[in-house]
C-alpha cells in the first residue's frame, strides 16, 4: 500500500502551526457552486468504508482545507472530497476537524476526488500553468507534493469519470512522480489496497434520481 509519508525536523515540531491556528473557511472564495456538489461529496463520504481499516482509523472528508507546505503554512487546497487511511478520524483523537494539516498528520490522502465545474476544470485537469510567486496548482500539489496515489475527476454534465494513478518512471527513478490515466471498464475503479471500488451508479440518492459516483464493496454497486 502506497501512503505518502511526510517528515519534518524535530527542532521545528513545536513551532509549527496547528489545525487551530489555520483558517477553516475557503478564504476569498465563493461557496459551493451548486446543489450537486455537497450531495455528491456526502455520498462519497458515507460510502468510503475500506474493510482493511477500523472506521476510527479512516478519515473521509468533504470540502476541508488541506494545508500541505510547512514553508508556506497558509497555502492550502480544498478538495471536493478526499480519503485518508491510517489516521484518526478525529483531530488528536478527540476533536472534529477544522482542516487537515499535513505537517501534523504526516500522511497524505490515498485518494482525492474533484467534481468538475466550468470555473475549476482547467486546474483540476492539470491544464493550467502556475504563475511566478503563486502557489502550485491542484494538480501539482496532488501529483508532486502530496503524491496522492489515486486522483479522480468526475464531470456530471458529460457523465465522465476519469482516474489517475501516481507512478515513478522505472527507467529513471530520479524523475518526479507523474499521474498516469487508468483504464476504467464499465466506469469502475477497483482499489485493491483498500478492498474497495469506486464507480458510477444509477439510482436515487436523497430524493434525486441520476448518475452518482460512489464507493462499493466487492459484492458490487
Q: What do the PLM-derived regions correspond to, one by one?
A:
Residues 2-33, 47-50, 68-73, 89-111, ...:
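C-terminal interaction segment
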Amino acid at each position: 500500500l502506497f501512503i505518502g509519508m511526510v517528515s519534518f525536523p524535530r527542532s521545528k515540531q513545536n513551532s509549527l502551526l496547528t489545525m487551530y491556528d489555520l483558517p477553516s473557511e475557503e478564504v476569498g472564495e465563493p461557496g459551493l457552486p451548486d446543489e450537486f456538489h455537497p450531495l455528491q461529496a456526502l455520498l462519497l463520504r458515507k460510502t468510503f468504508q475500506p474493510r482493511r481499516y477500523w472506521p476510527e482509523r479512516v478519515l473521509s472528508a468533504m470540502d476541508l482545507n488541506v494545508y500541505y507546505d510547512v514553508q508556506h503554512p497558509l497555502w492550502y487546497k480544498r478538495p471536493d472530497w478526499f480519503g485518508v487511511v491510517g489516521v484518526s478520524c478525529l483531530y488528536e483523537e478527540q476533536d472534529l476537524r477544522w482542516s487537515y494539516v499535513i505537517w501534523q498528520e504526516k500522511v497524505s490522502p490515498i485518494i482525492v476526488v474533484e467534481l468538475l465545474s466550468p470555473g475549476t476544470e482547467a486546474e483540476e485537469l492539470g491544464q493550467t500553468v502556475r504563475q511566478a510567486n503563486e502557489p502550485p496548482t491542484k494538480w501539482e500539489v496532488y501529483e508532486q507534493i502530496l503524491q496522492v496515489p489515486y486522483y479522480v475527476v468526475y464531470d456530471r454534465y458529460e457523465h465522465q469519470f476519469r482516474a489517475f494513478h501516481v507512478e515513478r518512471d522505472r527507467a529513471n527513478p530520479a524523475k518526479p512522480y507523474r499521474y498516469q490515466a487508468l483504464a476504467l471498464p464499465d466506469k469502475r475503479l477497483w482499489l485493491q489496497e483498500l478492498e474497495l471500488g469506486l464507480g458510477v451508479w444509477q439510482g436515487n440518492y436523497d430524493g434525486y434520481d441520476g448518475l452518482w459516483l460512489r464507493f462499493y464493496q466487492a459484492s458490487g454497486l
